[in-house]
Amino acid sequence: MTITRHAQIDWDEHGNPRSRDFSDVYFSTESGLEETRHVFLVQNDLRRRFTELQDGGRLIIGETGFGTGLNFLCAWQLFDECAPANARLQFVSVEKYPLSHADLQRALALWPELSPFAGQLLDQYVAVHEGFQRLVFAGGRVTLTLLIGDALQMLPQLDGQMDAWFLDGFAPAKNPEMWTPELFAELARLSTSSTTIGTFTSTGWVRRSLNAAGFKMKRVPGIGHKWEVLRGTFIAWPEDVAHPPAAKPWLARPAPIGGERKALVIGAGLAGCATAQSLAQRGWQVSLLERHAAPAQEASGNPQGVLYLKLSAHGTALSQLILSGFGHTRRLLERLQRGVDWDACGVLQLTFDDKEALRQKQLADAFPESLLHLLDKPAAEAQSGVALNSGGLFYPEGGWVHPPALCHAQAAHANIRLIAHQQALELRRVDDQWQVWSEEQLVDSAPVVVLAGAADIQQFSQSADLPLKRIRGQITRLPQTQASTALRSVVCAEGYVAPARLGEHTLGASFDFNSTDLTPNLADHLDNLGLLREISEDLTSRLDTADLSPEQLQGRAAFRCTSPDYLPIVGPLADREAFMQAYAALGKDARQVPDITCPWLDGLYVNSGHGSRGLITAPLCGELIAAWLDNEPLPLPRSVAEACHPNRFALRGLIRGKGKQTVGH
């Protein structure tokens, strides 16, 4: 995979940025704000469109070339001025060479009138790496999805429809690789009959190429040193060009749920709380059902979890999900209390054998240093603060999180009602509503239900066939000592140990595929202490573990929930039996695509199977569920969303000839 690097920038005598890669300016040095507003806001008629948005309505803008974010900030400023209080702005922008935080801060300082919005962007502009990166502002009122990479690689992965386009980027003469018929075809694919477009260039071949792609473009007077600019509207896909292939029916979007915007989310762990918040921020009224007294009482209840990116150098779906999810979670954590709720202390993965050394070398070659880099033994010891057995791979933006803090913060939204001490046992579909029953008691009903209760969702007949499995894990809590305060980073080998939180270190974690007993046991505590010794004999000594009697060892056990392919299970659920009947032909020829609408269980969704990566993947998957339900652009590449789709297991069962057998068991 290609390493994404930051933009290379020179600054002129007036402090204006200029791209070294393209030998071009980011904006007019004379009238940058005026040009942005004229070319993109005026030509897309955004003042009127923002003003006329319905309460709860939204407008989605797509952009080529995020650059300094000037266009985004101007659009946000106008939206904030004109739109109804409950309207939403979604902005999707592709950028090959993102600015570093320092360069972005310096560039935006040129526009003091945008500072209220620029400050929020800078606060959230962390962990912006390759792929889809979701940034959320103003309590979800404004959403920015950055597609970090080449436009012709990123836009084909985007699943959504834009209301307006900002066709920006460096001038065609400076950046000819972007201004191509292939790009314009992607803009057309992502447009509807009411989509508008504005661009600063009035070059004839650009206008003709956009017309050929299905837009109707015209030249209009420019502003400043731009004599003319282009504006247009998408009319229709060209008759002489083959339509882009539609999504296979078992992966297509279900029809939108009309009527009451109410949802029930079952399970108040990381996945459930994230899903509830994502829906609540979009105006849904959410009932969050939890069988315990409070959120985060099971696997999400550990005192410290590690933000550790187990990546692949080969750009797998799981690796893409982890990279996007890590960035999203890191940005969420910026709003919590550092040092108590979380800490970006970095994560060091030790090189504990030759196989791990090779894996780390491949990762270091595949990703930028700002995400991960190799440290030799002396550097690793200097970074961690303790003596180690080896060097390793350091993730400077990683750290530890107190998962309950994140869950409670997300569940605190005013549109969320927590229903505690309530175990959901059965789902019934009655009059276009899902009813949740506990024994013979009707708990609540809504047109939408999201199952987020880890492997417990298998108790419902509608999701009983999902191949989820439990893996028991036990952590050990060790009291901080004066000597153990030297530990400055999370350190991992086969296990992990984190710097102290509120006077205790967390050490873990065991993996037990057979036990169903959640009582902490001495054997696993001793195994965890063995993992600690593999990490650092020095730290083991600093923690005075030799002086601890077995009865003093404290900890907790919980079940991780994972799937056979280690990807989470996220998306809409189908009727299993009807699915097998509808697509039975795939059992004879897997290349067939029967023209049969998927038999969805209308309004029933799942967000589960996050394993030990829940801190990284569950919050972004909450956004994915909300995007499915509200027909928004997906916050992940389409291929990644499809790789996480619940239907993948039934589909594999058909193709492998297993018929109605439960896949994965």
UniProtKB/Swiss-Prot annotation:
Its EC number is 2.1.1.61, 1.5.-.-. InterPro entries: FAD-dep_OxRdtase, FAD/NAD-bd_sf, MnmC-like_methylTransf, SAM-dependent_MTases_sf, tRNA_MAMT_biosynth_bifunc_MnmC, tRNA_MNMC2, tRNA_S-uridine_synth_MnmC_C. It catalyses: 5-aminomethyl-2-thiouridine(34) in tRNA + S-adenosyl-L-methionine = 5-methylaminomethyl-2-thiouridine(34) in tRNA + S-adenosyl-L-homocysteine + H(+). Keywords: Cytoplasm, FAD, Flavoprotein, Methyltransferase, Multifunctional enzyme, Oxidoreductase, S-adenosyl-L-methionine, Transferase, tRNA processing. Residues 266-665 are annotated as: FAD-dependent cmnm(5)s(2)U34 oxidoreductase. HAMAP family: MnmC. This is tRNA 5-methylaminomethyl-2-thiouridine biosynthesis bifunctional protein MnmC. It comes from Pseudomonas syringae pv. syringae (strain B728a). The gene is mnmC.
